[in-house]
Design a protein with these regions (language model features):
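Short terminal hydrophobic/aromatic SLiMs and anchors at protein ends
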Residues: 1, 7-11, 15, 19-20, ...
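Accessible peptide chain termini
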Residues: 1-2, 29
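Metal-dependent phosphohydrolase cores
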Residues: 28-206
Length: 206
């Protein structure tokens, strides 16, 4: 009988797994892949436009920012997550969450505007630091005012001071800290909420 019990237990597990796979497929099919990808492209472009709005206040423009997210496996990895962030009722299958984790790590390690790209922050150029700060502003605005993923509602400066400034993992030079803080201060002073929200609003109707 123990063998019989093991057989039925195994069979039940297989049936449960098949059910979950079928459920995920049916649920995904309710939202077309075209809809998910269209939203992802719009959201990614809004992030880039928001970043370049802030960069423009400083006299910069970063046209190549996040270009890797527009095609291939990177796009697939991010598309379902981006759609789910704005549509909480959308059930993201674990397979797509796992792919996102892989692509997120790859993006952060291969793109120079992310700290994970560097073994030593002294390698970061001043222009790339400015792109980083603008990226933080774009991400912060989205998470605080649109997706509400920042429960602490931290400003960029508070986030930098809390997470990065004194983090032993990053050995910032005083020059880098001064550049980061002066850039943050400038953007917090001159960035206009009404102008920035206009960049993101079209997403809310998609």
């Amino acid at each position: 009988m123990p063998q019989c019990d093991a057989y039925y237990t195994h069979l039940i597990l297989i049936l449960q797994l098949k059910y979950l796979i079928i459920y995920d497929i049916i649920h995904i099919m309710k939202i077309s892949l075209e809809t998910i990808n269209k939203f992802h492209h719009a959201r990614t472009q809004a992030h880039i436009d928001c970043l370049n709005y802030h960069a423009g206040l400083l006299g910069y423009h970063f046209p190549e920012h996040d270009n890797d997210k527009h095609s291939g496996t990177m796009m697939t990895g991010y598309a379902y997550i981006n759609y789910g962030r704005y549509h909480p009722e959308f059930n993201i299958p674990e397979t797509h969450r796992s792919l996102f984790r892989q692509m997120h790590k790859e993006h952060h390690t291969t793109q120079s505007h992310h700290l994970e790209h560097y073994s030593d922050v002294s390698e970061i150029s001043d222009i790339t630091l400015i792109e980083m700060v603008c990226d933080w502003f774009s991400a912060s605005f989205e998470q605080r005012y649109l997706t509400h993923e920042d429960p602490d509602d931290l400003s960029v400066l508070k986030w930098f001071n809390t997470q990065l400034r004194n983090n032993p993992k990053y050995k910032w030079s005083q020059k880098q800290i001064d550049l980061i803080c002066s850039t943050i201060d400038f953007l917090e002073m001159y960035a206009n909420y009404d102008e920035v929200i206009k960049i993101w609003l079209p997403l809310l109707s998609m």
